[in-house]
């Protein structure tokens, strides 16, 4: 019996770029690029979609009335980092008028929205959610709302590192990102 060992070294997987992500089509899936690695998830469930849409509607009404900027919904990707690339797609986002990308922009705008809304699904893991919040804040987001429909709570994260937890009787506040916007959690949960 031979005593020599054979070692096989596997090549590291090639990292994907934001441009390659644009060319990738995976029907009926939610995809993001995290530090060059493609992350594929199942579509969101009904409750997730309803909460996202309720809040997007309220935000859109406010933004249209004030001319503050634009609201975008799920599947809108934002390039938050390069080499390796990170492209995240929030459930709802607000971009202020001053930071709006050119309407002819193809691909993913290289910016973090001013306000990011993430609605948790039952299979979301806390560590992954915190990593996502970190990516948003490092990418330029000023305010991140993480809504948990199951527990009926919201965690609010700010670029200055502070955070707030709201119970189901709490009120979402646009703070200095969307002045004069507020809505009760009961109206969206």
Enumerate the predicted regions with their spans.
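Gly/Pro/Ser/Thr-rich low-complexity, intrinsically disordered segments predominantly at protein N-termini
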Residues: 1-189
């Amino acid at each position: 019996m031979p005593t020599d060992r054979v070692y096989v070294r596997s090549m590291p997987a090639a990292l994907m770029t934001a441009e390659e992500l644009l060319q990738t089509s995976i029907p009926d899936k939610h995809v993001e690029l995290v530090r060059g690695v493609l992350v594929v998830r199942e579509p969101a469930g009904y409750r997730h979609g309803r909460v996202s849409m309720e809040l997007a509607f309220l935000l859109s009404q406010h933004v249209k009335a004030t001319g503050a900027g634009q609201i975008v919904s799920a599947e809108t990707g934002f390039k938050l980092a390069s080499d390796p690339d990170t492209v995240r797609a929030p459930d709802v986002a607000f971009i202020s008028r001053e930071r709006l990308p050119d309407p002819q922009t193809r691909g993913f705008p290289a910016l973090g929205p001013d306000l990011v809304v993430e609605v948790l699904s039952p299979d979301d893991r806390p560590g992954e959610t915190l990593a996502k919040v970190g990516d948003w804040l490092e990418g330029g987001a000023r305010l991140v709302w993480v809504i948990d429909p199951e527990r009926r709570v919201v965690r609010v994260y700010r670029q200055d590192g502070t955070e707030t937890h709201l119970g189901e009787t709490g009120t979402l506040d646009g703070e200095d990102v969307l002045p004069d916007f507020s809505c009760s959690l009961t109206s969206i949960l």
